[in-house]
């Protein structure tokens, strides 16, 4: 290992990576553990494309891309997409699925901090979906995302609020009652309050543009975007 890479490699939780490695082969199973990600992906994609003024012809980085659900969908919109993840197995699944689908995505196994050291200011759009709550130092990820985007470019984050309601819905409800995601997927202590995320953003060149909640209705079994950021939320920022 190159010695200069060791500090940024510290921002990796190997237990978190192992959780996703164990189920990577089922990433594209529409009825499997990642069914919620497939269900919400059209909402995510629509929000990102609308707020960024379209994706066609743009250079996009998906941080924490996993098996490539969002990365592939952005490539289908005409973007040149790079997917970044530290999980070997999810990336192998992503590469194979892209090959089978005839979609061009460049998948890279390295931390966002490592990538920022080599590719600062090279992306029109950077997305970081449900990744911040899975690393030891989420603020470092925010800083790296700010470094990677071009002036005037867009950076999108999504994560989970930290409060009793989010614990009840995202952990108790989603993992143990509805079994929408595997048990142990989330650790409420790692959830991030919007004020915390905005504080980290304010310490970079990024500026907040819009925030929205992602809501699940268990009665209708549907998802929607709208006001209220008590549980899942998305943040659109722009490089000054």
Curated annotation (Swiss-Prot):
Catalytic activity: a 3-demethylubiquinol + S-adenosyl-L-methionine = a ubiquinol + S-adenosyl-L-homocysteine + H(+); a 3-(all-trans-polyprenyl)benzene-1,2-diol + S-adenosyl-L-methionine = a 2-methoxy-6-(all-trans-polyprenyl)phenol + S-adenosyl-L-homocysteine + H(+)
Enzyme Commission number(s): 2.1.1.222, 2.1.1.64
Family: Belongs to the methyltransferase superfamily. UbiG/COQ3 family.
Organism annotation: Escherichia coli O6:K15:H31 (strain 536 / UPEC)
Gene Ontology MF terms: 2-polyprenyl-6-hydroxyphenol methylase activity; 3-demethylubiquinol 3-O-methyltransferase activity; polyprenyldihydroxybenzoate methyltransferase activity
Pathway recorded for this protein: Cofactor biosynthesis; ubiquinone biosynthesis
PANTHER family named in the record: METHYLTRANSFERASE, UBIQUINONE BIOSYNTHESIS O-METHYLTRANSFERASE, MITOCHONDRIAL
Gene (name only): ubiG
Protein's name in the database: Ubiquinone biosynthesis O-methyltransferase
